[in-house]
Curated annotation (Swiss-Prot):
Result when mutating residue 158 to F: Decreased conductance, due to decreased diameter of the channel portal
Protein name: Small-conductance mechanosensitive channel
Molecular function per GO: identical protein binding; mechanosensitive monoatomic ion channel activity
GO cellular component: membrane; plasma membrane
Residue intervals on the Cytoplasmic side: 53-67, 112-286
Source organism superkingdom: Bacteria
Assembly: Homoheptamer.
Protein's GO biological process: intracellular water homeostasis; monoatomic ion transmembrane transport; protein homooligomerization
Naturally occurring in which organism (per UniProt): Escherichia coli (strain K12)
Residues in the Periplasmic compartment per record: 1-30, 89-90
Chief localisation class: membrane
Amino acid sequence: MEDLNVVDSINGAGSWLVANQALLLSYAVNIVAALAIIIVGLIIARMISNAVNRLMISRKIDATVADFLSALVRYGIIAFTLIAALGRVGVQTASVIAVLGAAGLAVGLALQGSLSNLAAGVLLVMFRPFRAGEYVDLGGVAGTVLSVQIFSTTMRTADGKIIVIPNGKIIAGNIINFSREPVRRNEFIIGVAYDSDIDQVKQILTNIIQSEDRILKDREMTVRLNELGASSINFVVRVWSNSGDLQNVYWDVLERIKREFDAAGISFPYPQMDVNFKRVKEDKAA
């Protein structure tokens, strides 16, 4: 009896296979196609990821940033590949995409600060407003850039402090790069007493800047009376020099101005104010 049941089961299974042969063949083809999609997608993801990494390294982009962005490209391609494979075997990909979208939204809301810094880091890498080794002012913080990472930028101030600034704050503020241009301009505002001889002051200032070798003579040099101030007449001196010489030129020229003016008897007045008193006579009693 049991032998008959086994035979009947085998016959039933055979009949079902024959009846559903087309359906099984279709499923088999879809599964093989899905596997092929996954294999090809993984190969393409690796090739494109490596190409992106090499491209960014060739453009001297930080290795950490290059690795992160290339990995982001790779996993993005893999995600699309898996969705395509699921669709090939009959899974409703619309619901999968909806779930992934909801999960991504939740993660984005939870990490919006970090994602903002990430997006800002990508923009800094793409547009390169500053590079490691350059002296910059980032939102009021000045120093030498040590590294530009995905989420933050590290810099050293002139007094030796190490400061880490989130990239989101950098993008939202002003970026001043002091190192990008090879030459820069110094400006001096020199105030002298009102009884000083204007021509003598201009001649001394002109001689000082003409004799300074680090000042670029092929650039415009300005020595002009700029303002009649409350306590002094103010001259403006504008000169150009190489960026590396800028600060030393400023200090040395300022010292020479003081020495030359002292030798010529030209004084630098202190802020002063004239106060006039007016006597008011009291009315006599009637």
